[in-house]
């Protein structure tokens, strides 16, 4: 039998059979949970679809609402991880963060951070709209408003700074540190830009190294 559960709200724990140490607060929070344990859901429809998974935390209306069997996820914010179904060990903090995610080990902090991510794994995005177009790209790190915001399928980019790598879509293995660094880069790979506006205009030029404020800022397609 279920034990040590705390529930308050319409349909909370309606299907619970043997799950322990769960907390559900809000209409339909943890409504379909059967055997999962150590879950916390606060908000209307929070973790509504969860059935057997453990160690999930969802705070906010619809947070983690579609999650069924994914474990060890944290969703804080309205619609955070809202339609995610099976992903595990994800952290989404901010409205709509990781909203459609199904992959594992992603961290998104900020309004709409990684909102479009589906199967991309092992990403870190911090900042409003950070990596928000990413769908399948993995092992990317972005920090700053709209950093890597156009990235869709590229892997292994590191982008730190306001609008750094803003336009990048499929370029991989780039490093951009600084305000507007590699801002216009779209498909080029293996660039390193350190400094405000370093390689800012670069679009398709690959294998460049630019260190310092405005370093190679006008370079577009060349390799230096």
Question: What residue ranges belong to the model's regions?
Answer:
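Glycine- and small/polar-enriched repetitive beta-structure motifs of secreted/surface proteins
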Residues: 1-224
């Amino acid at each position: 039998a279920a034990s040590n559960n705390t529930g308050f709200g319409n349909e909370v724990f309606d299907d619970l059979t043997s799950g322990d140490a769960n907390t559900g607060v809000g209409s339909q929070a943890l409504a379909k949970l059967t055997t999962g344990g150590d879950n916390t859901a606060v908000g209307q429809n929070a973790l509504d679809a969860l059935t057997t998974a453990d160690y999930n935390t969802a705070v906010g209306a619809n947070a983690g609402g579609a999650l069924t069997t994914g474990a060890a996820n944290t969703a804080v914010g309205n619609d955070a991880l809202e339609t995610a179904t099976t992903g595990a060990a994800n952290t989404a903090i901010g409205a709509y963060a990781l909203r459609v995610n199904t992959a594992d080990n992603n961290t998104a902090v900020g309004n709409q951070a990684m909102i479009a991510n589906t199967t991309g794994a092992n990403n870190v995005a911090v900042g409003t709209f950070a990596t928000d177009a990413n769908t399948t790209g993995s092992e990317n790190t972005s920090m700053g408003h709209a950093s890597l915001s156009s990235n869709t399928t590229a892997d292994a980019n590191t982008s730190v700074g306001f609008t750094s790598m803003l336009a990048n879509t499929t370029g991989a293995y780039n490093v951009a540190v600084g305000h507007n660094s590699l801002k216009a880069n779209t498909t080029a790979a293996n660039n390193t830009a350190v400094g405000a506006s370093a390689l800012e205009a670069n679009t398709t030029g690959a294998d460049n190294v630019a260190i310092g404020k405005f370093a190679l800022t006008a370079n577009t397609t060349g390799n230096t």
